[in-house]
Amino acid sequence: MRIVFAGTPDFAAQHLQQLLDESHQVVGVYTQPDRPAGRGKKPQPSAVKKLALEHQLPVYQPESLKSEEDQAALADLKPDVMVVVAYGLLLPQAVLDIPTKGCLNVHGSLLPRWRGAAPIQRAIWAGDLESGVCIMQMEAGLDTGPVLHEERCAISPDETSASLYHKLESLGPEALTKVLKDLDGYQSQAKPQSDANATYAKKLTKQEGKIDWTQPAAFIERCVRAFNPWPMSWCQSEHLKAGQNTVKIHAAELIQGASNKGPGTIINSTHEGIDVVTGDGILRITQAQMPGKKAQPASTLVNGYSNVFSPGLELQ
């Protein structure tokens, strides 16, 4: 079966590697154009491009797939199926129609829950107890196609987006190759999604990481895990230099207790953690990153930054 692969980040490269390991016939690889990265802002190839070139696979990097010329180039590859994993470009219907067996997408959620750009983060943010990957037959709509197969995994109480990402990174490739071995069979039993049960995982922004201390401690703690490694949950202190007053929270936990102090007020600082009042409950910060520094445990922070983390002071 002639496979065209489309993907960009490391998550996608893991799936391409699985196809190559199992000797599938990959006839072409699509990935986003090289983007400036690093301090020098030099154009850098994607993880998928690097892997494809290592295996002497033809690489295509169109800015979009809307032009007739780019669509003709894809058609010339005569694909039986196109596998799409975190590609980052929308595929017009004309592209979806080119492979004889259509286009398959590996999506990091249990569809129809968390269609969209940030399914891993939103699952933790919302307090979901499980996640997984779906192999979906692509349609013109955003993650709306029928589901051919799903694999589930539990979301642990201390799960971060980084750790859940790695779980799905191992589930996805196995699920994909399982489907490809009996594609006709899986397609014949594909299950339509229920639009009524759909939720949308909107893209994260840096501003969303700003902690609102009037929110419940349980919600803030989920945000700390959901937004790690990006955009990170963060707050500010008026006791740090203006313009360099952002504190990134890497880890936190819920503790029992209550206080009549206002949200954002620090009520206790020990080597175990920095206890902050929220709109409902107490949040203990156990690891944070000061401006220009690496992440540090609370035991280091309370000694080195008593001007920021002493009881009675506030975080904004």
Swiss-Prot record:
One MF term in the entry's GO annotations = methionyl-tRNA formyltransferase activity
This entry carries the following GO cellular component terms, namely: cytosol
Q: What class of enzyme is it?
A: transferase
- The domain of life is Bacteria
Which keywords fit this entry according to its UniProt record? Protein biosynthesis, Transferase
Residues that, per the record, bind (6S)-5,6,7,8-tetrahydrofolate: S109, L110, L111, P112
- Enumerate the InterPro entries for this protein: Fmt, Formyl_trans_C, Formyl_trans_C_sf, Formyl_transf_N, Formyl_transf_N_sf, Formyl_transferase-like_C_sf, GART_AS, Met-tRNA-FMT_C
Q: Which reaction does it catalyse?
A: L-methionyl-tRNA(fMet) + (6R)-10-formyltetrahydrofolate = N-formyl-L-methionyl-tRNA(fMet) + (6S)-5,6,7,8-tetrahydrofolate + H(+)
In the Enzyme Commission scheme, what number(s) does this protein have? 2.1.2.9
Q: Among its keywords, does the record have Manganese?
A: no
Gene3D superfamilies given in the database record:
Formyl transferase, C-terminal domain, Formyl transferase, N-terminal domain
PROSITE patterns assigned to the protein according to its UniProt record, in alphabetical order: GART
Q: Which SUPFAM superfamilies match?
A: FMT C-terminal domain-like, Formyltransferase
Q: Is Transferase tagged as a keyword? A: yes
A single Pfam family it belongs to is Formyl_trans_N
Q: Which family does it belong to?
A: Belongs to the Fmt family.
Q: What this chain does, per the record?
A: Attaches a formyl group to the free amino group of methionyl-tRNA(fMet). The formyl group appears to play a dual role in the initiator identity of N-formylmethionyl-tRNA by promoting its recognition by IF2 and preventing the misappropriation of this tRNA by the elongation apparatus.
Task: State the name under which the record lists this protein.
Answer: Methionyl-tRNA formyltransferase
Species of the source: Idiomarina loihiensis (strain ATCC BAA-735 / DSM 15497 / L2-TR)
